[in-house]
């Protein structure tokens, strides 16, 4: 299988990861977890939002959970946040819906991952392309992006 830009970044930074591949017709996070036989608590989805200040933020939550917009707003000191429209995702991040990764976005955005990720040695999330996931230590994300961990679900 080809490597994605996310995988190349991880290779360049010498960060250990395990790639996972699945049928690229699957875009639902729970289906991805089931297909890969992974615990859905350890498989994360990447969500892009906009705050009342018009700043964009990235939130990374387990696929079996929903982002709590109030908790998310508090985590980034915003009055409120809302999800961006799907059609804005590609121009803003360089990724499409179902293939959005917290690593390698067009611009660096403040990113918050649900604190439950820290309960696990390894978590899995999109490698930047539908059909590709990377499994890695959540603490290693700090070496790559501006990320904090907070209760956002």
Segments and roles (model prediction):
Residues 1-153:
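Extended, low-hydrophobicity, polar/charged segments
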């Amino acid at each position: 299988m080809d490597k994605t830009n996310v995988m190349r970044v991880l290779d360049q930074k010498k960060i250990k990861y395990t790639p996972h591949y699945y049928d690229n017709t699957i875009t639902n996070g729970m289906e991805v977890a089931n297909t890969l036989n992974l615990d859905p608590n350890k498989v994360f989805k990447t969500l892009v939002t906009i705050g009342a200040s018009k700043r964009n933020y990235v939130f990374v939550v387990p696929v079996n959970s929903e982002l709590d917009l109030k908790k998310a707003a508090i985590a980034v000191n915003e009055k409120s946040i809302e999800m961006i429209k799907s059609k804005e995702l590609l121009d803003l991040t360089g990724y499409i819906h179902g293939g959005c990764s917290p690593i390698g976005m067009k611009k660096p955005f403040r990113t918050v991952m649900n604190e439950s990720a820290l309960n696990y040695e390894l978590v899995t999330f999109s490698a930047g392309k539908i059909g590709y996931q990377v499994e890695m230590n959540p603490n290693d994300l700090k070496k790559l992006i501006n990320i904090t961990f907070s209760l956002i679900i």
